[in-house]
C-alpha cells in the first residue's frame, strides 16, 4: 500500500486517465522548483568530467573545456519551466551526457556518432503520432514548420484525453513532453518552443528525409561519393547538383516545399547525411546570417580539407531576369562579407573555404557558382 509515489515519463494522456476524485495528482513537470531536477547543469557536467579526469580515466590531452564545447550543441539547452527561462542555467540531457561519457571513459575516445541512439525511440513515437489518423496532413505541416524555422509558438497543455490528442495545442504539447521541443522564451501569452539541440534537430530532418525519399529515392552511394569529393578534394559541384536535382524531382510535394524557407529545410535535411561536417544553419557572421556553414568535424575526420558556406536564393517562377540579376548581385556581396569574417576564419581549422551561391527559380537551379574562383 503506497501513500505517495512519484511517476516519471508520464504523458499528458496518461495523466488525464490517472487523475480522478480517487487519485489526486500533482503535475510538477513545469514547476520551476523542479526545473533543474530534470537534467544536468553545466556545473554538474563539469564536476563529472573532473571526477574522471582526477581518476585518470580521461586522457590528459582531452580538456574539460573541449568536452563541454563538443557536447554543448548536441545535448544542452533544455528548459522545462517558463519562470526558469533566462534565470536558471539551461539543462543538459542526462541520458545523452552519460552516453558520451561512457564512450569517453570506457573506450578512451568520444563517440563517433554524437546522436544518442537511446533518443531515437522518440523518433519512432513521432512517426506514429503523425500517422495516427486521416488528419495527418496538418501535423506534417507542423513538423515541417518546426524543422524549417527551429521553433513554434503555442500554449502547453498539462493533460488531455486521448480522443483530443491530435488537436494543434495538444500535438505540440506532446512534442514538448517527448523532448522534441523545449522552452525558448515567450511571445505575448504564448511560449516560444524551440528545437533544443542538434541531437533532436537531426530527428526532425530524418523525418523529412523519410518523407522526401518516399517520393524520390535517395541514392546513398552516389551521395556518399559526392560528400567525399567535396570534403576531401574540394569538388563541391556533384554534391550541390545532386541536392538541387532531388529538389526538382520531388514533384509530388512541390506545393509543400516551395519557397526559400522550405528550400532551406530540404537542403538542410540532405546536408545532415554526412558526418564530415557539422551543419550550422543561420549562423551569424558580420551582423548577417549565412544560410549554411559546413563546419569541418575535424575532431573525428582530420582528413577533411575543405569547408563551405552556402547562400541560397529563391525566386518565384514568374520572376524576371532583372530580378534574378539583382538578387544574385546581392547574394555575392553578402557571402563575400561572411567569408571575410574573423570568427568564421577561426573555425576553419586549416581547411580551404569555398563560398557557394545557389540560385533557385521555382524548382530549378538556374545558377550555382563559387564566389572568388575555385572548382
Predicted features along the sequence, with ranges:
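Hydrophobic/aromatic beta-strand patches that form the interior of the parallel beta-sheet core
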Residues: 6, 308-310, 354-358
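Substrate-engagement module of ASCE P-loop NTPases
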Residues: 1-3
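A short acidic (Asp/Glu
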Residues: 16-21, 366-370
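Glycine-rich, histidine-containing beta strand-loop boundary motifs that form or position
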Residues: 6-10, 17, 185-187
Amino acid at each position: 500500500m503506497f501513500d505517495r509515489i512519484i511517476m516519471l515519463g508520464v504523458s499528458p494522456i496518461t495523466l488525464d486517465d490517472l487523475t480522478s476524485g480517487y487519485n489526486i495528482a500533482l503535475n510538477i513537470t513545469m514547476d520551476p522548483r523542479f526545473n533543474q531536477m530534470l537534467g544536468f547543469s553545466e556545473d554538474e557536467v563539469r564536476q563529472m568530467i573532473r571526477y574522471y579526469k582526477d581518476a585518470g580515466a580521461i586522457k590528459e590531452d582531452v580538456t574539460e573545456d573541449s568536452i563541454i564545447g563538443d557536447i554543448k550543441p548536441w545535448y544542452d539547452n533544455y528548459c522545462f519551466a517558463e519562470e526558469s527561462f533566462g534565470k536558471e542555467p539551461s539543462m543538459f540531457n542526462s541520458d545523452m551526457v552519460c552516453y558520451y561519457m561512457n564512450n569517453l571513459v570506457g573506450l578512451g575516445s568520444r563517440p563517433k556518432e554524437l546522436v544518442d541512439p537511446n533518443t531515437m525511440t522518440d523518433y519512432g513515437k513521432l512517426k506514429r503520432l503523425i500517422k495516427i489518423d486521416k488528419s495527418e496532413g496538418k501535423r506534417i505541416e507542423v513538423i515541417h514548420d518546426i524543422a524549417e524555422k527551429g521553433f513554434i509558438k503555442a500554449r502547453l497543455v498539462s493533460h488531455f484525453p486521448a480522443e483530443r490528442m491530435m488537436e494543434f495545442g495538444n500535438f505540440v504539447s506532446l512534442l514538448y513532453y517527448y523532448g522534441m521541443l523545449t522552452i525558448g522564451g515567450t511571445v505575448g501569452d504564448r511560449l516560444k518552443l524551440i528545437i533544443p539541440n542538434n541531437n533532436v534537430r537531426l530527428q526532425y530532418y530524418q523525418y523529412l528525409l523519410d518523407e522526401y525519399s518516399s517520393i524520390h529515392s535517395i541514392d546513398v552511394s552516389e551521395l556518399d561519393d559526392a560528400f567525399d569529393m567535396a570534403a576531401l578534394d574540394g569538388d563541391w559541384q556533384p554534391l550541390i547538383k545532386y541536392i538541387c536535382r532531388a529538389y526538382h524531382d520531388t514533384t509530388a510535394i512541390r506545393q509543400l516545399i516551395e519557397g526559400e524557407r522550405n528550400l532551406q529545410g530540404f537542403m538542410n535535411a540532405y546536408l545532415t547525411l554526412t558526418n564530415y561536417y557539422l551543419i550550422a544553419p543561420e549562423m551569424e557572421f558580420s551582423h548577417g546570417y549565412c544560410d549554411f556553414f559546413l563546419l569541418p568535424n575535424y575532431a573525428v575526420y582530420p582528413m577533411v580539407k575543405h569547408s563551405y558556406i552556402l547562400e541560397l536564393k529563391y525566386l518565384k517562377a514568374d520572376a524576371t531576369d532583372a530580378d534574378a540579376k539583382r538578387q544574385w548581385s546581392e547574394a555575392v556581396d553578402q557571402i563575400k562579407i561572411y567569408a571575410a569574417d574573423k570568427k568564421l576564419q577561426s573555425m576553419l581549422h586549416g581547411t580551404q573555404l569555398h563560398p557557394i551561391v545557389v540560385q533557385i527559380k521555382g524548382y530549378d537551379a538556374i545558377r550555382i557558382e563559387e564566389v572568388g574562383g575555385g572548382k
